[in-house]
Amino acid sequence: VSSNIGWTDETWNFLLGCERVTKGCDGCYAITTANIRKSNPNPKIATAYAGLVERNETGRLDWTGQIRVVEDRLHKPLTWRKPRRIFVNSMSDLFHADVPIGVIAEAFAVMALTPQHHYQLLTKRHARMRAVLRSARFAEMVLHWLRTTDQWLPAKVRVSAAQRAVAIKTLSDRAETEPMNPLPNAWIGVSVEDQATANLRIPALLDTPAAVRWISAEPLLGPVDLTAWMAPRTPADPADAPSTWHEWTWPDWVPADARQQIESFWSESIGRGPRRWLQNAHDNGAPAFGQEWTTHPSMRPAGSPADRHTGRYIHAWNNIGRLALPDGSMGYTSFTERHVRDQLGLHWVVVGGETGPGCRPMHPAWARSLRDQCRASAGTSFFYKQHGDWHPAPTQLVLNDPAWTLMLCGDTKESWTFQRGPRHHNELDGEVIEEYPVLLGAVR
């Protein structure tokens, strides 16, 4: 179904039904939508939504807890040839406990067979998301679906042998005991409404294999600090860096051995210097200077019994780096584009205020803070969806304006208004910000 959600093109609702889990669910639009659609004059639609919502003992409209798989929608993206961004299950949660793991695997097989699309998955069930996507058994289930397409695909859907072979290769380049390689076109995200849910869900997201990791902070109900999960920028842009090491100042945490090796390799005496060093880091897509970085097992420091070592990254040359280890010593590491992607942290942050009856205002300072955090990071894109039904009021009311209810927030310079109806209030400080994550190629 074509979508009016600003950050997607299409919704793929092969699951219906859900349950509230945190206060971000209090104004859930899907409950109201399901209640309307259960009375749709089209019997097919009415049947699909029947029994999903009811009024509880307090009179509140709520989910019944029933989860329904709509089988004839599961393969729909295979019929969409034009590339598009697809929001997976806006009317449910793919990782709800009652969604069969076989259905999740079948959905991932469909995603693997349609690399022209980008799939946007969003969940509040962070624990099951991590458990499923880190499971070697789940990887084998997805591969089974891919190897048996002739047994389950509808007759009208055509998948070429080459298309299937590419999908199988993408997912099978792994040891049998390892989780599935991330699908390059699957963006895995969690919902975050305040700092508590950020602290709860984001660590699980970062521990989940994903090509793109993102959060939806909508409705945003409080201030959120994401800097712990964002990569820092390099200390200077190459163009602004000094040309000699004499002018360069190393942070105290950089080990002396690392300084000596880097300054020797990038010596001005052979036409190099800090400017060339930073440009090399930029050209090779290196991790950010000072970013927390975990070594690949094959690159552990000499003499170390640990399979993996974590420290702060310092670029050396090409795809080679050094680590400032917690004890002050130097370690060795390297990277591929895939490793950078996996350790980058959050790639995308979507922010929006709440809409609908009883909606709660979003303070503009909360949104501004997230915007500024993204802009200060190395690679986290920011998408501002909307203020919500509470939004800045116009400076003047003129004849034939709609009715306004004005409220002056004591800690802002703006008057705010509550207005239901068409929503185009997507400017933050006069700017429309609709960034998408930088998509990295799949590196094996």
PLM region descriptions:
Residues E193-A198, H363:
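Active-site glycine- and acidic-residue-rich loops that bind
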Residues S2-N13, R37-N40, K44, D173, ...:
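Auxiliary Fe-S-binding modules of radical SAM enzymes
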Residues I104, A198, A367:
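Aromatic/hydrophobic pocket-lining residues that form the small-molecule binding cavity
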Residues S90-D98, A186-V190, V351-R360:
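Surface-exposed cleft-lining segments at the edges of enzyme active sites
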Residues R134-A139, L206-A210, D372:
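Short, surface-exposed basic-aromatic patches at helix termini and helix-loop junctions that form
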Residues R85-F87, H118-Q120, N185-G189, V212-S216, ...:
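Structural preference for beta-strand elements that scaffold enzyme active sites
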Residues S92, R125-A127, V192-D194, P219-L221, ...:
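Active-site-proximal loop/turn and secondary-structure-junction residues that shape catalytic pockets
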Residues V1-L16, R20-T22, D26-N185, Q195, ...:
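Conserved Radical SAM active-site core
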